[in-house]
């Protein structure tokens, strides 16, 4: 499903910096449209709507005691004026957003066709207004300045319940915010606590601070908001609004941080990096002459730089390597002069798999106690475990049974059914692809699949998956496969079992 928050977004908030002038507002939009095009980033231009007749009590409409009331009334624009500005936003190829401060403004935003609606921090506990905003069913961005975590939990629960597509912005409502007030670690908290929701950074720090946006990007923020405007001979910006030049530097800092952070996937290693490591490695050399057929035991070798071309390195050496020809003292051990044994290759593969499985469980934040058994299903042999099989943690097996299963990336479990067992899968992490009785279904975290006795099924994962199996009592030899070769195998040939992680029981 398409999400309006699928790309990183930059929000330029004009607020009242148009100063009540349509012409000045158009100039601001044009200048920041140039910034968006030059930096080639996806930008949103944001307005603020206030229906002053209903927002401000009639007895206070001319008050000078509250600086905001005076500011709002002195920069007031008509609806037609905002339409002109919105049309210019579209002409510049920018997306549009607006913050309502009253219910009537919500209707106006919806009628004018804005792309996004914004909840200001000061309105984030205004439940009559929040309910009205949720009923607009527009993509919603929620600022959280000054809110307690319980209040943010309430917001998340409410907008989830209403079915709104929304994002949260960590925000500090101090104008301007000093460095020691930014609390950027809140982004980490939000990312962990609200893992399925896009998280952003709504910033009021000084415009010359371009470090904060880089930190926010590195912590996983995907929306970035600043107040913007233009200085003129008559108009001076406040201390937390950016000029086009400052906004460009702000985005440059984001771009630089993006390059430094990478894409978050397993990184590829450039050839020059590999070369720089190779020339620092130690090669394996002989302490004394050695005859063909002897083994490279520790007393016969030493490790030293440089590592020569095609030479065995110290990390690959083991005492079971056999020499295929006679060699002299100080000779390098070249790979074409040795025979590396492949006995116990299957067990080595399983031990390698354990490391990857532990990492996947850690990534999924799944904690096991010290009392469990593990089971490798390797239907076509240990050597093919990474392609065909599954890893099982046996937790409980009584009248009921619980297992945790791990599918490594690209690993498939063959088609089979159970004679007695009824089971339900529930995905804890990643995605599980399943086929039951010929029907394919993709399971995401939290989703379940019931499999009754006699139902043919298979499963696999493209990127890796951890899922729970809750079932009736497990019985050995209860699985029937559609491959006769697997059915004909003894259980001990297609299963390797161990206590805990198999320490000292799965041998090299």
Where are each of the predicted segments found?
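Glycine- and acidic-residue-biased ligand/ion/polar-headgroup-sensing regions
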Residues: 408-409, 419-437
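Tight coil/turn sites that cap or link beta-strands
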Residues: 293, 330, 408-411, 446-448, ...
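Double-stranded beta-helix
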Residues: 462-508
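Conserved short histidine dyad/triad with adjacent acidic residue
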Residues: 386-388, 403-419
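Short acidic-glycine-tyrosine-enriched beta hairpin
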Residues: 424, 438-456
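A short, N-terminal "cap"/entry segment at the start of jelly-roll beta-barrel domains
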Residues: 343-400, 492-508
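Catalytic cores and adjacent flexible loops of soluble metabolic enzymes
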Residues: 1-351
